[in-house]
């Protein structure tokens, strides 16, 4: 119908990479309640890692969900699994958990959880990569990459973002609904980066604006439609083929929006937030 359309593509590594040790660790303990308790020092900060690890255990042991308990990470009993960054936890800790499941499954042969009370099953995985500049054939900077294409559709009459479409190659979607949520959340975050948010600082990197003046994106500014497309593609031979989908969801959004505005008025916008958009012209919502 003649509405301006912008498109952008991105790629993003999963894991720390570049030769830095990148460990995932997990301990499965059959406790007195005759259930398998999952312990890992990987912080679950909203990305759904706990759900993923439970699914990994159920899938790889055949145990019922009711027999699995995810324990929040702690430094007392949970093995260190690195920080929650770099879109790494589903991959590295997911694989560590899968390896622990192999040991648990072997012990369960001909037995029940009642027979295994008090036993621990440990798994770890090191995502091996090469340092930058390594003099080796075919150096590996990261163990996996995610890919994405996002599209922005503007309403030609109002200049508002009408729809966002985000297609992401996630390898294997352990939890498809969670993947969609990650995509939608990342798009909304980047809509803020693109259209409204600023974080001004002085020459000493001290913030110069109050929190309420940062232009944080609000719920009533979200576009009418965000379409998340989860693309599954085999290839990775660890963690069931899952590739992290955290940070990449926020990368191509702003460029896609900038491209759409360029097609609307021919102006290239090269700084964030984008200048002379609907959020600048009017006080109404950006979406």
For each predicted feature, which ranges?
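C-terminal catalytic domains of large/alpha subunits in multi-subunit enzymes
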Residues: 1-10, 55-281, 285
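Short beta-strand micro-motifs enriched in acidic
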Residues: 29-33, 155
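Conserved strand-to-helix beginnings and helix N-cap segments that scaffold or border functional pockets
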Residues: 50-51
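Glycine/charged-rich beta-loop-alpha catalytic/anionic-binding loops adjacent to active sites
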Residues: 32-38, 239-243
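Gly/Ser-rich, acidic/histidine-flanked active-site/gating loops
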Residues: 43
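Short, aliphatic-rich beta-strand segments
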Residues: 35-40, 161-163
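Accessory "access/gating" subregions that flank catalytic or transport cores
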Residues: 1-29
């Amino acid at each position: 119908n003649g509405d301006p359309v912008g498109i952008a593509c991105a790629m993003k590594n999963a894991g720390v990479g570049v030769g830095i040790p990148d460990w995932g660790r997990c301990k499965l303990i059959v406790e007195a309640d005759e259930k398998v308790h999952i312990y890992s020092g990987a912080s679950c900060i909203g990305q759904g890692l706990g759900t993923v690890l439970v699914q990994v255990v159920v899938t790889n042991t055949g145990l019922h969900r009711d027999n699995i308990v995810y324990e929040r990470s702690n430094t007392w009993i949970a093995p260190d699994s690195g920080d929650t960054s770099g879109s790494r936890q589903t991959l590295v800790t997911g694989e560590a958990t899968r390896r622990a499941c192999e040991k648990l499954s072997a012990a369960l042969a001909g037995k029940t959880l009642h027979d295994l009370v008090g036993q621990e099953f440990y798994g770890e995985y090191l995502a091996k990569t090469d340092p930058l500049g390594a003099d080796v054939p075919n150096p590996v900077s990261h163990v996996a990459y995610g890919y994405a294409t996002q599209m922005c559709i503007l309403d030609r009459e109002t200049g508002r973002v009408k729809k966002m479409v985000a297609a992401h190659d996630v390898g294997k979607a352990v939890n498809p609904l969670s993947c969609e949520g990650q995509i939608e959340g990342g798009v909304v975050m980047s809509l803020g980066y693109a259209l409204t948010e600023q974080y001004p600082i002085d020459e000493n990197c001290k913030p110069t604006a109050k929190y309420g003046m940062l232009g944080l994106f609000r719920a009533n500014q979200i576009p009418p439609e965000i379409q998340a497309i989860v693309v599954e593609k085999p290839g990775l031979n660890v963690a069931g083929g899952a590739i992290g989908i955290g940070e990449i969801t926020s990368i191509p959004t702003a460029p896609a929006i900038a491209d759409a505005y360029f097609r609307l008025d021919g102006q290239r916008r090269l700084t964030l937030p984008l200048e002379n958009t609907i959020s600048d012209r009017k006080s109404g919502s950006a979406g």
